[in-house]
């Protein structure tokens, strides 16, 4: 398959090297276009008021891989690849492997998921891969599963246009309990701003935070209750696959507001 791979951790990240090399070694036609530096939690931002530069990168990846480092956001990278760098569209857009989970409401901030979402917006099935640890350096099990999943999709394509958000627990391959189709949960954070003063007396802030609670999504979303939540299955060493789409229309909200009047005066 022809694959485009991006990420938000940057061109030097171990996760994207492990993923891209594994897929190239499996015989796929792999192109990498990703940020030239760390761009985590940039969401779906695009660069509009300055030029975007992309440089060919050699010696980082498998010799069969063509790679570019881009000074834009993750979404910039995918958009640039699809419209300017690639000679023909890929069969799949992949993003990752991210260093850290993208579960629940975290996906709204995620550059990893947004890069994959950009592929889906352009009509290409896409997958975001995340290793649910900020410290583990063992991306091999995640890359192994990614290779298996891509091979499966080559034989049996995704039946509808969607993004698969895949989170892999940070354990050895033999310790993975299985794979489960999941629905998106809710992760609430307590955000703390660390206030500091620079040598010139100017105030600045560092945003820190930790998970406060993991809760069920609202019932009004009409999601099947028999489908487990992503944050729960990963905790039990299952791989989580959550199908996503970009249409954020709240169908229940339309129903609840259908009898409202919205006067202009």
From Swiss-Prot:
Its EC number is 3.1.3.5. A divalent metal cation binds at residues 8-9, 40, 98. GO terms for molecular function: 3'-nucleotidase activity; 5'-nucleotidase activity; exopolyphosphatase activity; metal ion binding; nucleotide binding. Keywords: Cytoplasm, Hydrolase, Metal-binding, Nucleotide-binding. Binds 1 divalent metal cation per subunit. It is found in: Cytoplasm. GO terms for cellular component: cytoplasm. It holds the Pfam family SurE. It catalyses: a ribonucleoside 5'-phosphate + H2O = a ribonucleoside + phosphate. Its main location: cytoplasm. Its cofactor is a divalent metal cation. Nucleotidase that shows phosphatase activity on nucleoside 5'-monophosphates. NCBIfam families: PRK00346.1-4, PRK00346.2-2, surE. HAMAP family: SurE. This is 5'-nucleotidase SurE.
């Amino acid at each position: 398959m022809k694959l485009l791979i991006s990420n938000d951790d940057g061109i030097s990240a171990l996760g994207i090297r492990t993923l891209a090399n594994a897929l190239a070694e499996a015989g796929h036609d792999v192109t990498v276009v990703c940020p030239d530096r760390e761009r985590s939690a940039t969401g779906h931002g695009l660069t509009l008021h300055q030029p975007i530069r992309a440089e060919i990168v050699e010696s980082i990846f498998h010799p069969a891989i063509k790679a570019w480092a881009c000074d834009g956001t993750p979404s910039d990278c995918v958009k640039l690849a699809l419209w300017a760098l690639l000679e023909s569209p890929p069969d799949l857009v992949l993003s990752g492997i991210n260093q850290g989970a993208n579960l629940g409401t975290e996906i709204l901030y995620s550059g990893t998921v947004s890069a994959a979402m950009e592929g889906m917006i352009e009509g290409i099935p896409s997958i975001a891969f995340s290793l649910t640890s900020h410290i583990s350096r063992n991306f091999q099990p995640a890359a192994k599963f990614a290779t298996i999943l891509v091979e499966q999709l080559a034989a049996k394509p995704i039946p509808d246009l969607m993004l698969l958000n895949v989170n892999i627990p940070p354990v050895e391959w033999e310790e993975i309990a299985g794979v489960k189709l999941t629905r998106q949960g809710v992760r609430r954070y307590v955000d703390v701003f660390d206030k500091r003063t620079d040598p010139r007396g100017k105030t600045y802030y560092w945003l820190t935070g930790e998970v406060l609670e993991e809760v069920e999504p609202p019932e009004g979303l009409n999601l099947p209750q028999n489908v487990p939540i992503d944050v729960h299955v990963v905790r039990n060493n299952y791989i989580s696959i959550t199908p996503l789409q970009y249409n954020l229309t709240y169908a229940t909200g339309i129903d609840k507001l259908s009898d409202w009047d919205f006067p202009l005066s």
